[in-house]
Amino acid sequence: MTDENIRQIAFYGKGGIGKSTTSQNTLAAMAEMGQRIMIVGCDPKADSTRLMLHSKAQTTVLHLAAERGAVEDLELHEVMLTGFRGVKCVESGGPEPGVGCAGRGIITAINFLEENGAYQDLDFVSYDVLGDVVCGGFAMPIREGKAQEIYIVTSGEMMAMYAANNIARGILKYAHSGGVRLGGLICNSRKVDREDELIMNLAERLNTQMIHFVPRDNIVQHAELRRMTVNEYAPDSNQGQEYRALAKKIINNDKLTIPTPMEMDELEALLIEYGLLDDDTKHSEIIGKPAEATK
């Protein structure tokens, strides 16, 4: 069973946006502040806990279950490891590429953890979820009411914003039935022009906040190469302070909202306003016409 006092959060975002890196650095800072945390990796790459564990990839629930024959044959200590500052780490895993549903690993892992008492003596459970909300399996932490606070990692790049809007749409779908809410956008900077202003504008349109702007800093990559969080690798760095600031904001966050996703033309108008997308009027002679008609 799950303690009702636990705050269950999830980090979503476009693939490659730096979601796992951002979440682990932020959760490490939260652990430094005395929060008791468990990370449940919901990505078949199983990279949601590697900075916490100083490892390439943790053995996943699905992988071990396949070896043993059934998830019921596993022991909790085999799949839940302890990392930096006592953070508990689990990776759900997924099937071989092209075979089966990766969302099944999330469902199997969470059920196993609940049935074996993993959710006891915790302040936060964090789900690190693959990419966009592309299927019901990956939306499972939202759909089943597991994750109550969603943080979307995005940037001022066009596809990251498209993904953020789609994720907001997924949250809205389950907000009334499951009680899930959007906690805010985390801008993981790509040094796009007017990036902070753009993401604040996007957040306002989505009825949420830009909870923090994480500047780009090479020290993040230096720490990653050593399989460490910034907080452990360079605790006195400016970037470490940024993650601590974000951690504090999440701990104290009470602005949990039902998002208002944008229609595609509204989102594209925002992108045009900030110069990320060409104005279609410049190409009106070909827009909307069959390809053969524009040769």
UniProtKB/Swiss-Prot annotation:
The modification ADP-ribosylarginine is found at R104. ATP binds at G13, K14, G15, G16, I17, G18, K19, S20. It comes from the Bacteria. Pfam families: Fer4_NifH. Its EC number is 1.18.6.1. The keyword Disulfide bond does not apply. GO terms for molecular function: 4 iron, 4 sulfur cluster binding; ATP binding; metal ion binding; nitrogenase activity. Keywords: 4Fe-4S, ADP-ribosylation, ATP-binding, Iron, Iron-sulfur, Metal-binding, Nitrogen fixation, Nucleotide-binding, Oxidoreductase. It catalyses: N2 + 8 reduced [2Fe-2S]-[ferredoxin] + 16 ATP + 16 H2O = H2 + 8 oxidized [2Fe-2S]-[ferredoxin] + 2 NH4(+) + 16 ADP + 16 phosphate + 6 H(+). [4Fe-4S] cluster binds at C101, C135. Binds 1 [4Fe-4S] cluster per dimer. InterPro entries: NifH/chlL_CS, NifH/frxC, Nitrogenase_Fe_NifH, P-loop_NTPase. Its cofactor is [4Fe-4S] cluster. GO terms for biological process: nitrogen fixation. NCBIfam families: nifH. Belongs to the NifH/BchL/ChlL family. The key enzymatic reactions in nitrogen fixation are catalyzed by the nitrogenase complex, which has 2 components: the iron protein and the molybdenum-iron protein. Homodimer. This is Nitrogenase iron protein 1. It comes from Nostoc sp. (strain PCC 7120 / SAG 25.82 / UTEX 2576).
